[in-house]
């Protein structure tokens, strides 16, 4: 391994707007390209990208915009629906956004004439996280600074409502058992809810605040990761409600934590935009130091490719992609 893990982005894509959030589609979409969505001050853009790591005849990255959706307000979060398919006739693009006006918008498009959106209203403060139920895609969970986690159906009706003790920062759905939901709070508590019984069944404590982001490891659902204060933290929920591992990473406070979709030992973190740049790091649990470090002028958002050890971050009028090894 190289001594210096710092490096520039492997690939970049120019965008027409500052990128606040970016998300690879985490679900199989029936097509060879990888769907990606990013949001700026006014728009959500849906595109496909293919990388040389997966297609021999591609040089670097091949990117194509499929559709731009007018949003009218800053986009803060994006979640893909598992109902999205590129191989159906017509194709189905389905995703939802959270925005600065405290509303969730559910978009459906066939990439031709049908472009619909529905507004889900109810949160009374900033929405920090949202996610579709990964099996059927018939429900959306969201968490907010208003100290609630809410479950919505696709008609915009709230089907469940959990009162939190502090702002809700992240929400994740169990990939197989869709009645299990993980909610992370800013006060350092991570709770698992049983949606059938509508009650908490387990909780973890970070012992550090503020907890800014947490993520359930989809390769091993006994693992949960988070960033709180300057540190990353990892729990094994079968062993303790306190972290098994933790390490300081970002001097200017850590911001986001995301597990890789292909390895239970690989994860990425970002720091808050500092005076000069946002720090981005990829970590491997077998290595004491980050295996890759990058810096983005004004970075926000963080997402892993579904099948490659590749991350994307949004920046000033661009998307930046980093590649690592598993």
UniProtKB/Swiss-Prot annotation:
Name a single GO biological process.
Answer: chromosome segregation
WD repeat start-end pairs = 6-54, 61-109, 115-154, 159-195, 199-237, 242-282, 287-324
What is the protein's quaternary organization?
A: Component of the Nup107-160 subcomplex of the nuclear pore complex (NPC). The Nup107-160 subcomplex includes NUP160, NUP133, NUP107, NUP98, NUP85, NUP43, NUP37, SEH1 and SEC13.
Chief subcellular location equals nucleus
Q: Does the keyword Signal apply?
A: no
Keyword line: Cell cycle, Cell division, Centromere, Chromosome, Chromosome partition, Disease variant, Kinetochore, Mitosis, mRNA transport, Nuclear pore complex, Nucleus, Primary microcephaly, Protein transport, Repeat, Translocation, Transport, WD repeat
Q: Which SUPFAM superfamilies does the entry mention?
A: WD40 repeat-like
Which source organism?
Homo sapiens
Q: What does this protein do?
A: Component of the Nup107-160 subcomplex of the nuclear pore complex (NPC). The Nup107-160 subcomplex is required for the assembly of a functional NPC. The Nup107-160 subcomplex is also required for normal kinetochore microtubule attachment, mitotic progression and chromosome segregation.
Q: Where in the cell is it found?
A: Chromosome, Centromere, Kinetochore; Nucleus, Nuclear pore complex
Q: From what superkingdom does this record's organism come?
A: Eukaryota
What name goes with this protein? Nucleoporin Nup37
**Record's keyword annotation contains Nucleus:** yes
């Amino acid at each position: 391994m190289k001594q210096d893990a710092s490096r520039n982005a492997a690939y970049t894509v120019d965008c027409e707007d500052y990128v606040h959030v970016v998300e690879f589609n985490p679900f199989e979409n029936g097509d060879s390209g990888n769907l990606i969505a990013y949001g700026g001050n006014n728009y959500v853009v849906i595109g496909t990208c293919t990388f040389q790591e997966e297609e021999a005849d591609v040089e670097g990255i091949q990117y194509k915009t499929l559709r731009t959706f007018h949003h009218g307000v800053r986009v803060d979060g994006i979640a893909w629906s598992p109902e999205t398919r590129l191989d159906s006739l017509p194709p189905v693009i389905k995703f939802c956004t959270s925005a600065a006006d405290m509303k969730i918008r559910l978009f459906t498009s066939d990439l031709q004439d049908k472009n619909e959106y529905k507004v889900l209203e109810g949160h009374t403060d900033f929405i920090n996280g949202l996610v579709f139920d990964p099996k059927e895609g018939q429900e959306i969970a969201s968490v907010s600074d208003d100290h609630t986690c809410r479950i919505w159906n696709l008609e915009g009706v709230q089907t469940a409502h959990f009162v939190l003790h502090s702002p809700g920062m992240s929400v994740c759905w169990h990939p197989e058992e869709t009645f299990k939901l993980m909610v992370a709070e800013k006060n350092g508590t991570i709770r698992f809810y049983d949606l059938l019984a509508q009650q908490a069944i387990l909780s973890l404590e970070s012992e550090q605040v503020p907890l800014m982001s947490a993520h359930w490891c989809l390769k091993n659902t006994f693992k949960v990761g988070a960033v709180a204060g300057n540190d990353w933290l990892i729990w094994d929920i079968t062993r303790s409600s306190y972290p098994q591992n933790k390490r300081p990473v970002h001097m200017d406070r850590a911001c986001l934590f995301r597990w890789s979709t292909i390895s239970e030992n690989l994860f990425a973190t970002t720091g808050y935009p500092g005076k000069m740049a946002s720090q981005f790091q990829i970590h491997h649990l077998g290595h004491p130091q980050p295996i890759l470090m990058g810096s983005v002028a004004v970075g926000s958002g963080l997402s892993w490719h579904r099948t490659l050890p590749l991350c994307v971050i949004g920046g000033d009028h661009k998307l930046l992609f980093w590649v690592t090894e598993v």
